[in-house]
Amino acid sequence: MSPAVDTASTAKDPISVMKSNASAAAADQIKTHEYEHLTSVPIVQPLPITDRLSSEAAQKYKPNLPGGFEEYKSLHKESLENPAKFYHERAQLLNWFKPYDQVFIPDTEGKPTFENNAWFTNGQLNACYNLVDRHAFTQPNKVAILYEADEPGQGYSLTYAELLEQVCKVAQILQYSMNVKKGDTVAVYMPMIPQALITLLAITRIGAIHSVVFAGFSSNSLRDRINDAYSKTVITTDESKRGGKTIETKRIVDEALKDTPQVTNVLVFKRTHNENIKYIPGRDLDWDEEVKKYKSYTPCEPVDSEHPLFLLYTSGSTGAPKGVQHSTAGYLLQALLSMKYTFDIQNDDIFFTAGDIGWITGHTYCVYGPLLQGCTTLVFEGTPAYPNFSRYWEIVDKYQVTQFYVAPTALRLLKRAGDSFTEGFSLKSLRSLGSVGEPIAAEVWEWYSEKIGKNELPIVDTYWQTESGSHLVTPLAGGATPMKPGAAAFPFFGIDLAVLDPTTGIEQTGEHAEGVLAIKRPWPSFARTIWKNNDRFLDTYLKPYPGYYFTGDGVARDKDGFFWILGRVDDVVNVSGHRLSTAEIEAAIIEDDMVAECAVVGFNDELTGQAVAAFVVLKNKSSLTAASESELQDIKKHLIITVRKDIGPFAAPKLIVLVDDLPKTRSGKIMRRILRKILAGESDQLGDVSTLSNPGIVKHLIDSVKL
């Protein structure tokens, strides 16, 4: 390969304000690790699937890539060299109300471009029809949703016919009781229950746009997302259940809506039937009462291929959450293809994604992907630790799950709990295991393979993002690609990866490469924009390295062609697979009257992958020396509670360090790199600190962390 960016163009200053931060962080990260050992990690070939199946099941099984790795390489090459042909053939897997004119808007070489990123132009379809109607017509009694409630033994199933009826009734509530129109945004703040999926499907059925907010966010965060999307309608529950605890979702919504004047209606599903929940007449509607008013069928609204399907807010390095906007046709197709090929989905499969619909994993691989394929999706309301650490494996055996997809954080928790919780379960129904949200450490990968996969199952260690909509780098189940413990492996179809030098932007070639991960051209499910802020979309993703999509992650490629994801190189922390903006957390802390300055960074954590650390300077600096230890602890607890209330419990700092000052350059910029190094125990590897205006602060910071 030859460099895609010439030295003349890369010698200029970057046009994005964030490139200097990203390149410095990436360069620092790369210098502090040795990645040459990755090549020595052994390649693992899973046992052929037919060897693990009964003779009857083996006869029925038809792999989606029967030609294995060679077929993958051939199809991947075709998806890059002839994308129009590749995607046109596979677009027939969707049902269209109106055929499209062309697959994408091509450049002079017949390839898609970031500048004109539109797919299946002038075609019309409907997401809900593709997820529900077509399967309800052909296999009405097939189970679409299996629901496992927080409490064991509670739950139920919905067939595709039953799902269609419930979706149609909620769609009519939206249209006629709540006056939701095509193109309106609808905010969804719900737990992992079937009604959450029904809600999303009903919204898409009428051509509206869903904006799901994770039901762990605070009222302030919910308010900000409702206002940014200008949602006039909110759908929620009275309460929710998780890990044996009750969460007051309706109360949180009510608090958020004190500052959302545009909201006219709230639809409430009664999950717990708590009679003490307050309802506001004229605004709040009872789900159970409303569904009684409407008939069991209403037609779908055709929408253009590029019609916005949903918004999903993700953390940004500048603090304010970004409403990532996905279009309909391209997202649907790539979600379907990733289900088909990554997981080697068969029609009778039961797919269990242990992820929340408040994040992209729940969107693509709990809702859209499985239902597009016409298989069964399992919705789990609870946690892996309630009522005990065997819960996941009980569910797998109970429902005969065929694919299990989970974040490494949960696996680390279960590994730490002890192997006894994995014993006594068959797990024979499983055909593949998945990992999502963050890189999985080799030792966790090996535990997952041995204890859950019996050293027989493929582990698809998937790398992707809210912005990508579906998998970017992943092994393929069904024995289609080899694996290495801890490696994301190979690019998915349509994904043209590049490893760039973080400073120059020049593509790194050769057997071994390290740098930042970028992508050379768009793919169907690539996000179209940031809601109402396309300039921010360009500045964040396309301007840091012109001609490329900048993922924000560091990467290494070994001599065997495997890609290894090395973590964030921007000011985003990945905690338990959740991307959190350090700037947003800093803003929450600085709002407190006692705080003068704050710098938030991530540090390695054995359980959550990364954790949040906040270095805080108080306005009254004398209190650091005058206060007792218990008073200092009270200050720290107060600041943690502040973040929990302003953003959500999952964003709370694990470590707060009260300091006299922060390390700053002469221009006043905080050198967060120094803070990260100190937390990593690398105080002897701080690098160039000559630009510090207060070099004496370094020893104070080191001593403060040790306390």
Swiss-Prot record:
Species: Kluyveromyces lactis (strain ATCC 8585 / CBS 2359 / DSM 70799 / NBRC 1267 / NRRL Y-1140 / WM37) (Yeast)
Role according to the record: May be required for assimilation of ethanol and acetate.
Motif (Microbody targeting signal): 705-707
Disulfide bonds: none
Protein residues bound to CoA: 242-245, 361, 576, 644
Pfam families, sorted: ACAS_N, AMP-binding, AMP-binding_C
InterPro entries, alphabetized: Ac_CoA_lig, ACAS_N, AMP-bd_C, AMP-bd_C_sf, AMP-binding_CS, AMP-dep_synth/lig_dom, ANL_N_sf
Designated name of the protein: Acetyl-coenzyme A synthetase 1
Compartments it resides in: Microsome; Endoplasmic reticulum
